[in-house]
Amino acid sequence: MDKFIEFLRNKKIHVVGVTGAEGSNILRFLIKHKLTGVTTHDCVKENQIEQSFKLWHKGISQTEKEKLFKGFLADLSQSHTSFGDKYLIGIDHADIVFTPQSWRLYKERNQKLWVAYKKGIPFYSITRMYLDYAKAQIIGVTGTVGKGSTAYILKQILENSGRKVYFTGNETWTLQMVDRIDEMSKDDILILEISHRQLLDGFSRAPNIVVFTNLFPNHLDELSWDKYKEIKTSLIKFQTKDDYSVINYDSSELRNISVRLRSKVLYFSAKSTHMNIKSIQYITTYLKSNKNMHITDNVLAAYSATSLFQDPKLLSTDFIPSLLFLPARMQLLSTKSSVNFYDDIKSTTPWSTMEALRKLGSNTVLICGGHTKGINYYDFIQFTEANTRKIILLKSELSTEVGKFFPNDKFQVYDCLKEAIFKAFKISGENENILVSPAAAFFYTDFIKGKDSIRKIITSLPPRELI
């Protein structure tokens, strides 16, 4: 880390998306180490800085948020700022650029970034900083679906190990902590949720332990299935014979890849109990007997990784009932007029929505919609038609895709979430479920941001007989 800091000294450093969770924490790291010549960029206007910062730092109390924002303004004052219309001005003269994982998504807005990238200016991500420089034992959790939940479960279990546990993910409720990287020792544990975009700017060291939840053809609007697989599996392929890969045996893609890995492979399986290591096979039985446990795969993955620490007390099922799960993932928000409302808006793929429906059963009205990311939805449509009371779609790419396969009388389309929830409530029977699970991307941006939250809509519902 010292060499990296010296490398940065006297360089023209540019930080993109500085009001975000990644950008603001990178700036904190730079200022903490007394690095000068920093230029900060954000597409928001200067009078929107506070609003944007607080939007991207959700998972803390209001008091903590105010304190963090005050510190951020102090850091920002020590940089040259390029906001609003000045966004990315001078980026082509940078010596090094720190970018958030999302920068490639906004091609039109970030054209100057692409020019700088193609020019050969080094781009660095916060994930690469963790992987390359953290002294802690790193557990990287990746996969198409369930990586955030698995990482969060793992954090809660390992906090009982007596070792200091650091955890950060892709969500706005988790704080980044690259500014604390120099505090981490080899006796500490750093748990990272890692998406494919976080690997695109490279890394020079793979985690000692990688947990791979599953692999599905996702993000096909950005890259091909083969390229997605190549990037997604780069973590486990870069591991050495001294590392461990915790692999979902139920994924044929991962199963085929696992036989060619240099690392030591541990399988976990919700379908084949005998494929789990002996020390956690009884956990499989426990989970199958608990009908309320809707994330069996994630719990098995976390316990399989935990087994590598060879501490029997950490493998107790006593932890399971007290586990906290991430918000907006099969979260029971409310029961009204004997109808259960579930918030699952973090489900941005058809596979995670289908899994939610398997857990809830066919007495469920599904509300979904969003950007399809180039995914083939035929299997999803067949499954949901057979396993739901009714499908309600919000007008989007997904509703267009569904319309290609089924006539309009098979489903209903609404322009706004409030209308969809009102309709779902009206047609639901006693002890039935309403599941808001997008199965596609940008649901929050398109249907919730700047509008009423799901909870607020539910609260405003009149008695069902009056609708």
Locations of regions flagged by a protein language model:
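Walker A (P-loop) phosphate-binding motif
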Residues: 126-172
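A short helix->loop->beta-strand "cap" motif at the edges of active sites that frequently abuts
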Residues: 34-36, 118-121, 239-244, 261-264, ...
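ATP-dependent carboxylate-amine ligase
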Residues: 1-66, 79, 93, 164, ...
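Glycine-rich, highly charged phosphate/nucleotide-binding loops
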Residues: 63-89
